């Protein structure tokens, strides 16, 4: 269903403000009293500029505290038109309101009484139209559909989730996976889980893209690329925790009582490591990463705010970890992948598709944006190929699994959508790459996994539901929290109906999200079931 603000920006919305403005003869005073709603309006303008629809979601408020400063600055630098509009609309009004307060300018009592009566009449009529909305649409909800009540409700949810997150270490401290290793104790083995960022399947050569964005991986033996994989969230702070734990869209609120996959491997006797090329986000990604024996958020290693290491810097840490020679090793990488600004995700000398500059967030620069984006995908190709090469050189049983947290809009159709994390997702934000690689010795030792992976390749898969159990399955980690019906490394895998984690942490079918016909056309074109 459509959750755009246009559903609430009607008579009820306009008249309630007009009625409130009649509560004081000093208009400036009332304007400042209603400042919170002015802030919502300014925020909404920026949101509409980015996504073209939807009210301010809970996730948008949470992003204010989970998005790191470098990401925020990269984005704000490309939102100039929206920021200019906000400044023109709101700053003069607030200045005039301040002058009105200081100079004690008052409207006449007669004028206020007359306008208040008119506002009451029109407000009453608009309430009747609201009742009509309930009759016409049985699914109509004040908390979801009436602006600004829906935004206020979302603010409350954001505060609630923030409090739960801050209490996470207390609510999860007694959790255990009861994990056990099932592979032979004497065998040396290494497993690597790579979580990418903002990489969409449509731009991967492995999935039929006409450009050479995966020149190395297309030649890689022992690699299976799953073409029909969707994420259950288009936001990093939700998607990545689902990849790193057993929670899914159907059980997301249990995350406050869970630990991550690193703890499962630790319980089974593995040496663990977590290396990230992202800054702290003060949420579950940090919590799960810090469970490891060794962890490093490399952007936090420098006091220089502008420090911008490439993802390949993570390979140095992997090399050091492998050199420790532990018999059982589990390594998790969280890359920066293809996050905007795309041009900053790879060294200038690695630009293959040009021109890749300028890349401002404008439709007229789409060709440049796509070039830069494809260069970032090509850089991920190099990263994964080098990582696989390092594992091959170990000569041990090894497996690697990769997916991205979500995809990206790049002005792909007449809607002119850009970036990700929009309250209503698009096809381009949902369809992501999903890869599994196994070493020769691993395939010889566990042929049943290789057979299952190749047999499940063309099936519809949710990364959010399958990444965790598949990694545990490949690693031979047995736990009651491993759902084998969602592991693509077993013949027990079963396709489930598609769901998406909405802004209120509820699982919803794709046709109940407000997605447009263009999105379903693209899903159908890719032969992806909805």
Task: State what each model feature region is.
Residues 27-31, 263, 280, 389-393, ...:
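Membrane-interface soluble catalytic domains
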Residues 208-212, 396-397, 403-447:
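Histidine-centered active-site microenvironments of extracellular/periplasmic hydrolases
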Residues 192-193, 376-419, 468-472:
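Metal-dependent active-site segment of extracytoplasmic phospho-/sulfohydrolases and closely related
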Residues 142, 249-251, 302-305, 366-378, ...:
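Active-site rim elements
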Residues 1, 7, 11-147:
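Transmembrane and membrane-interface helices of multi-pass
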Residues 274-276, 330-337, 374-377, 399-404, ...:
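Short beta-strand segments
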Residues 316-319, 357-400, 436:
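A long, amphipathic alpha-helix that forms part
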Residues 125-193, 198-360, 463-464, 469-493:
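Active-site-proximal alpha/beta segments of enzymes that process anionic O-linked groups
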């Amino acid at each position: 269903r459509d959750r755009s603000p246009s559903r609430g920006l009607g008579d009820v919305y306009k008249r309630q403000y007009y009625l409130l403005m009649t509560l004081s003869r000093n208009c400036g005073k009332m304007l400042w009293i209603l400042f919170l709603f002015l802030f919502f309006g300014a925020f909404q303008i920026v949101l509409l500029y980015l996504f073209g629809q939807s009210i301010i979601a809970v996730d948008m408020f949470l992003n204010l505290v989970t998005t790191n400063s470098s990401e925020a600055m990269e984005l704000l630098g490309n939102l100039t038109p929206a920021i200019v509009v906000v400044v023109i609309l709101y700053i003069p009004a607030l200045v005039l309101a301040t002058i009105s307060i200081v100079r004690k300018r008052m409207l006449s009592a007669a004028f206020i009484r007359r306008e208040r009566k008119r506002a009451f009449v029109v407000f009453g009529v608009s309430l009747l139209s609201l009742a009509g909305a309930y009759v016409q649409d049985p699914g109509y909800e004040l908390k979801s559909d009436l602006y600004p009540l829906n935004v206020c409700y979302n603010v409350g949810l954001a505060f609630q989730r923030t409090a739960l997150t801050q209490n996470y270490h207390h609510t999860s401290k007694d959790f255990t996976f009861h994990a056990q290793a099932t592979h032979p104790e004497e065998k040396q083995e290494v497993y690597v889980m790579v979580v990418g960022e903002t990489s969409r399947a449509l731009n991967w050569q492995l999935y039929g893209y006409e450009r050479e964005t995966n020149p190395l991986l297309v030649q890689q033996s022992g690699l299976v690329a799953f073409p029909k994989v969707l994420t259950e969230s288009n936001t990093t702070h939700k998607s990545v925790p689902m990849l790193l734990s057993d929670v899914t869209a159907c059980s997301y609120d249990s995350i406050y009582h869970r630990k991550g996959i690193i703890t499962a491997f630790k319980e089974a006797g593995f040496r663990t490591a977590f290396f990230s090329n992202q800054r702290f986000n003060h949420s579950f990604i940090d919590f799960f990463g810090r469970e490891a024996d060794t962890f490093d958020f490399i952007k936090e290693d420098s006091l220089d705010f502008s420090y911008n290491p490439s993802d390949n810097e993570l390979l140095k840490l992997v090399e050091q970890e492998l050199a420790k020679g532990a018999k059982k090793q589990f390594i998790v990488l969280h890359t920066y992948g293809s996050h905007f600004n795309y041009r900053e995700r790879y060294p200038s000398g690695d630009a293959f598709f040009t021109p890749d500059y300028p890349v401002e967030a404008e439709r007229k620069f789409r060709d440049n944006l796509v070039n830069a984006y494809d260069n970032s995908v090509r850089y991920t190709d190099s990263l994964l190929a080098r990582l696989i090469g390092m594992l091959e050189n170990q000569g041990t049983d090894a497996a690697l699994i990769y997916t991205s947290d979500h995809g990206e809009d790049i002005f792909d159709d007449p809607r002119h959508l850009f970036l990700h994390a929009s309250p209503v997702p698009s096809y381009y934000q949902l369809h992501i790459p999903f890869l599994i690689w196994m070493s020769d010795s691993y395939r010889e030792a566990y042929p049943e996994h290789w057979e299952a992976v190749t047999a499940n390749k063309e099936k519809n898969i949710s990364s959010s539901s399958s990444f965790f159990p598949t990694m545990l399955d490949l690693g031979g980690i047995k736990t009651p929290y491993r759902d084998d019906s969602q592991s693509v490394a077993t013949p027990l895998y079963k396709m489930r109906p598609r769901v998406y984690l909405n802004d209120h942490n509820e699982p919803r079918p794709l046709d109940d999200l407000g997605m447009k016909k263009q999105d379903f056309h693209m899903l159908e074109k890719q032969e992806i079931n909805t």
